[in-house]
Amino acid sequence: MNIGVIGSGGREHSLCFKLLQSKKVDKIFCIPGNAGTGEICKNLDIDILEFKKIYLSIKKENIELIIVGPEIPLVQGITDFLEKKILKYLALVKMHLN
């Protein structure tokens, strides 16, 4: 399985590191990633708020699961965008409390 991890911090580096230990993972793409993730997976130089560009890379690289690390793309609606494209993702979601 090809997995995409959105973010460029230590959290995303740790996720990539642990995911690579699974025999079910073929390749990991970090969007945009950092120097550390670049050593263990393929970084894709795309801004985390460029949802359309992220989607095109998901399709091009046959990414089957997206993991969203940072809060900013979540607040800006990346989960809604991914749902509309019928893509699998793992992320915290916004909850409305009354």
Task: Spell out what each predicted region is.
Residues 98:
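Active-site loop of classical SDR/Rossmann-like NAD(P)-dependent oxidoreductases
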